[in-house]
Curated annotation (Swiss-Prot):
Coiled coil: none annotated. Residues 39-120 bind DNA. Pfam families: Ets. It is found in: Nucleus. GO terms for molecular function: DNA-binding transcription factor activity, RNA polymerase II-specific; sequence-specific DNA binding. Keywords: DNA-binding, Nucleus, Transcription, Transcription regulation. This is ETS translocation variant 3-like protein. PROSITE patterns: ETS_DOMAIN_1, ETS_DOMAIN_2, ETS_DOMAIN_3. Belongs to the ETS family. GO terms for biological process: cell differentiation; regulation of transcription by RNA polymerase II. The gene is ETV3L. The keyword Transcription regulation applies. The lineage of its organism: Eukaryota, Metazoa, Chordata, Craniata, Vertebrata. Residues 178-201 are annotated as: Disordered. It comes from Homo sapiens (Human). Transcriptional regulator.
Length: 361
């Protein structure tokens, strides 16, 4: 049966909120338009709080975020009954409906104050899984790379801490798997003479597969449960210190040009420059972090697994080897490492050797 009740309240408009109070844009749903019966009580209360003409009926408490007082309980119950087409509505029934929200932690009654309630907006974000229209600051331990190919999705704040721990464990598991594959292998052999033949070298970042270290990949199962989350462009990483030198090209022997896939990119290795302290360079014990970027500026950032970091030690000559071991030559003065019969770009590679701490902490 069609309801002839008159609409109370006005459409949601975040710009019309009371000055000094900042509420989320998701406070109103699409169906909470004037005259709609499919509206929850707490949505209706927000509509009354927004409209100036109901200040004598219900109003925000001064100096308290999310706290409001019902000045005329009977009038609020009458307005709610008109909205829901229930003429027999009274404050007793309305208060029972409000107590339902206590268990849901959507709002609670303020102790010591009559007809005074307070919204728990942080809990509402988790209950309704809305789109939080803000740019969340990236974690410095997770978003150290360039903007990801698959952009991370926004997550309710109630599950961010759990997802953060799970992502850290996933990063460490990925590191252990990669180091386990590289440790038993000797110097890799390239097959540049044979076109079309695949190389047996594990090249980090050379495969065009899905992003396995990005936030969106670790949240795949969660995204399937959340309705329609939006994405945002993560901020650019902070500028690097002046004592860091960028080594262009992969640290493993590159595949022949005919075998390069269209989606592959050439990672860069970031190592401390010659202006840093001699001996061992110390890094905080961070897991392996990688950022997959777009265009020619894509980079793969490798950080040490242990607090000792990278150690540079003198070593005998090694140009006799046809390939380069991933645990070997890293020099800040080198711009590209070449394999096979090509000569090395810097003669200083003959007396330097980089030792990776491959065993997990």
């Amino acid at each position: 049966m069609h309801c002839s009740c008159l609409a109370e309240g006005i459409p949601a408009n975040p710009g019309n909120w009371i000055s000094g109070l900042a509420f989320p844009d998701w406070a109103y749903k699409a169906e909470s338009s004037p005259g709609s019966r499919q509206i929850q009580l707490w949505h209706f209360i927000l509509e009354l709080l927004q409209k100036e003409e109901f200040r004598h009926v219900i109003a925000w408490q001064q100096g308290e975020y999310g706290e409001f007082v019902i000045k005329d309980p009977d009038e609020v119950a009458r307005l709610w009954g008109r909205r829901k087409c229930k003429p027999q509505m009274n404050y007793d029934k309305l208060s029972r409906a409000l107590r339902y929200y206590y268990n849901k932690r959507i709002l609670h009654k303020t102790k010591g104050k009559r007809f005074t309630y307070k919204f728990n907006f942080s809990k509402l974000i988790v209950v309704n899984y809305p789109l939080w229209e803000v740019r969340a600051p990236p974690s410095p331990h997770l978003l150290l790379g360039a903007p990801a190919l698959c952009r991370p999705a926004l997550v309710p704040v109630g599950v961010q801490s759990e997802l953060l721990h799970s992502m850290l464990f996933a990063h460490q598991a990925m590191v252990e798997q990669l180091t386990g594959q590289q440790t038993p292998r000797g110097p890799p052999e390239t097959s540049g003479d044979k076109k079309g033949s695949s190389s047996s070298v594990y090249r980090l970042g050379s495969a065009p597969g899905p992003c396995r270290l990005g936030l969106c990949c670790h949240l795949g199962s969660v995204q399937g449960e959340l309705p329609g989350v939006a994405s945002f462009t993560p901020p650019l990483p902070p500028p690097l210190p002046s004592n860091w030198t960028c080594l262009s090209g992969p640290f493993l022997p590159p595949l022949p040009s005919e075998q390069q896939l269209p989606g592959a990119f050439k990672p860069d290795i970031l190592l401390p420059g010659p202006r840093s302290l001699p001996g061992a360079w110390h890094f905080p014990g961070l897991p392996l972090l990688a950022g997959l970027g777009q265009g020619a500026g894509e980079r793969l950032w490798l950080l040490s697994l242990r607090p000792e970091g990278l150690e540079v030690k003198p070593a005998p000559m090694m140009e006799a080897k046809g390939g380069l071991d991933p645990r070997e030559v890293f020099c800040p003065e080198t711009r590209r490492l070449k394999t096979g019969e090509e000569s090395l770009t810097s003669p200083n590679l003959e007396n330097l050797k980089a030792v990776w701490p491959l065993d997990p902490p």
